[in-house]
Amino acid sequence: MARIGDGGDLLKCSFCGKSQKQVKKLIAGPGVYICDECIDLCNEIIEEELSESSELKWDELPKPREIYEFLDSYVVGQETAKKTLSVAVYNHYKRVQAGGSGGGGGAEGAKAEVELAKSNILLLGPTGCGKTLLAQTLARMLNVPFAIADATALTEAGYVGEDVENILLKLIQAADYDVKKAETGIIYIDEVDKIARKSENPSITRDVSGEGVQQALLKILEGTTASVPPQGGRKHPHQEFIQIDTTNVLFIVGGAFAGLDRIIESRIGKKSLGFRAVLHGKDDPDASDVFGDIMPEDLLKYGMIPEFIGRLPVITSVSNLDREALIRILTEPKNALVRQYKRLFELDSVDLDFTSDALEAIADQAILRGTGARGLRAIMEEVLLSVMYDIPSRKDVARVVVTREVVLEHVNPTLVPRDVASKRAPRQEKSA
């Protein structure tokens, strides 16, 4: 701060020209001075520009084909789900854009009278097949706030557990408490099949974690102004609330819906009992493909209430991943697992190679475990544990080679010393 005695010359702000007596503080730099008022003004300008740059620019709203191509670079397979999501997300934000611009007179005014309803999305499919990744990738592309909520932790208001408003708090926190930005975000509610009621008939007793949660979610799914406690937890009469309008929040709800395939098969005429029964194992790809024939009545029989189903007009599914898809997941996406582990080893100045039959063995192990793509990382950790323990302490290793035997027989990977690697660098088996 630059202040001088009363007898000296008055210093002035180099930006607004006010003297030191007209402002609270004057901060000195090399040959320049700035007052506290100019600093506040600069902060306001910077914050305004940052908020504008972080908002989704409606003029640059990506087309469905562009959204699909972006999803394709991160998610392997699931073409139908990617196409459905691309169209649904494009239409949703086009609707937000139309709602944000007021209608004019004449023909434009008549068009503005047509109110576009929100289309939330229900995503069905087995675990580890890309449901959460699809939602995360969409939010990353559109640069909108994104929150993931677990439906199993939710209970009806007044009971032990989380209120549904806590879902909205996660979205507000993802937007750095910028409510306006949060109001155009995406919320993914996982494990929604776990809040199904026990039968298709209405319950005569309180079902606080099932049907009660579905009832509590109805309003925020449809669009309402919700009161959210800023610190989470239960609502108290004397605390202040954050008001958020969920009209333009896109909800994607997902779940494995185990057993729903049998309900669909019984409706479309496929036998699930008897000598001619169509039997599916837990990891049979056909068991999830039947989700393509789903109807709202199947979800009703599963235990979802009609009002909840009605607020999820877009229904799509992901299918089980086969061997080829799992190998592609290991190698093709931008953040593929093989690339991640190669990078980890590069940080220790070591090359990591997987033979093609090693990748096939890893994919086969993931199918046997029945955990989909999530099982790939666990298998990779098991396979590479011993070398990840030794390599940081050794400077003589140039390359690590993982073969089929390493995956299936739990032998140690091949370590190639630096002097040997430099002599025969070009001669190696085809590897990833």
Swiss-Prot record:
SMART domains per the UniProt record, alphabetical: AAA, ClpB_D2-small, zf-C4_ClpX
Name of this protein: ATP-dependent Clp protease ATP-binding subunit ClpX
Keywords of this entry: ATP-binding, Chaperone, Metal-binding, Nucleotide-binding, Zinc
Top-rank taxon, per record: Bacteria
Residues annotated as binding Zn(2+): C13, C16, C35, C38
CDD domains: RecA-like_ClpX
Family per similarity comment: Belongs to the ClpX chaperone family.
Binding sites annotated in the UniProt record for ATP: P126, T127, G128, C129, G130, K131, T132, L133
PANTHER family: ATP-DEPENDENT CLP PROTEASE ATP-BINDING SUBUNIT CLPX-LIKE, MITOCHONDRIAL, ATP-DEPENDENT CLP PROTEASE ATP-BINDING SUBUNIT CLPX-LIKE, MITOCHONDRIAL-RELATED
Keyword Metal-binding (UniProt): yes
Quaternary state and interactors: Component of the ClpX-ClpP complex. Forms a hexameric ring that, in the presence of ATP, binds to fourteen ClpP subunits assembled into a disk-like structure with a central cavity, resembling the structure of eukaryotic proteasomes.
Domain ClpX-type ZB: 1-54
Organism, scientific name: Frankia alni (strain DSM 45986 / CECT 9034 / ACN14a)
One MF annotation (Gene Ontology) recorded for this entry: unfolded protein binding
One of the protein's GO biological processes: cell division
GO CC terms: HslUV protease complex
InterPro entries found in the cross-reference section: AAA+_ATPase (IPR003593), ATP-dep_Clp_protease_ClpX (IPR050052), ATPase_AAA_core (IPR003959), Clp_ATPase_C (IPR019489), Clp_protease_ATP-bd_su_ClpX (IPR004487), ClpX_bact (IPR046425), P-loop_NTPase (IPR027417), Znf_CppX_C4 (IPR010603)
Keyword Chaperone: yes
HAMAP family reported in the protein's UniProt record: ClpX
